[in-house]
């Protein structure tokens, strides 16, 4: 349905991620044109959801990487007891743990994206795994990175809260980790669909 079609109403919605718009679409008598064969929508919808889940996983990967980078830079600039806080062992460990948690996720996102065009029989399950795993790993990194900035991490001054909110938003769009894992289990025949 073209967006300017008569009978289509678009209402902007507020959401936690102010860097991304969100809208509700209402259809009242709008003329729809089938994009595929009648009854063949399930496959097109599945592929669209899979692509969206992989894109959200990749977006989370980039957001978490940026939060780690900003935390490391902050640790070298912020001083406590006349030395950078990044020189303290506990802070070093926190940064190293964030990087170690994120690094294996790169391969998972790459493989899930690769499956979308090259290994279609694995595409849906891998999209689910990437979305669920990145949602959880990146939420943990977002929490640590925000705390690593102290009270400043919760303000507009440092900018990490934008990434924190984006990761939280991405976590729920197209299914939270629990729902996406349930979808993966159903796709693999482990539970009833």
PLM features: residue spans?
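Glycine-rich phosphate/cofactor-binding loops in nucleotide/flavin-utilizing enzymes
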Residues: 151-193
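FAD-binding core of flavoproteins
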Residues: 1-69, 73, 83, 178, ...
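Buried hydrophobic positions in well-ordered alpha/beta secondary-structure cores of metabolic enzymes
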Residues: 25-27, 64, 95, 105, ...
């Amino acid at each position: 349905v073209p967006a300017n079609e008569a009978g289509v109403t678009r209402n902007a919605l507020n959401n936690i991620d102010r860097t991304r718009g969100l809208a509700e679409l209402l259809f009242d008598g709008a003329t729809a044109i089938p994009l595929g064969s009648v009854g063949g929508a399930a496959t097109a919808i599945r592929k669209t959801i899979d692509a969206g889940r992989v894109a959200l996983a990749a977006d989370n990967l980039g957001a978490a990487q940026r939060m780690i980078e900003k935390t490391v830079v902050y640790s070298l600039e912020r001083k406590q007891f006349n030395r950078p806080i990044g020189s303290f062992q506990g802070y070093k460990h926190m940064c190293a743990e964030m990087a170690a948690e994120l690094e294996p996720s790169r391969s998972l996102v790459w493989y899930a994206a690769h499956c979308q065009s090259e290994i279609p029989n694995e595409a849906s399950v891998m999209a689910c795994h990437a979305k669920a795993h990145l949602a959880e790993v990146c939420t943990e990194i977002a929490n640590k990175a925000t705390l690593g900035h102290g009270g400043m991490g919760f303000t507009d001054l440092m900018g990490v809260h934008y990434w924190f909110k984006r990761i939280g938003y991405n976590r729920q769009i197209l299914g939270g980790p629990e729902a996406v894992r349930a979808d993966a289990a159903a796709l693999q025949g482990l539970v009833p669909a």
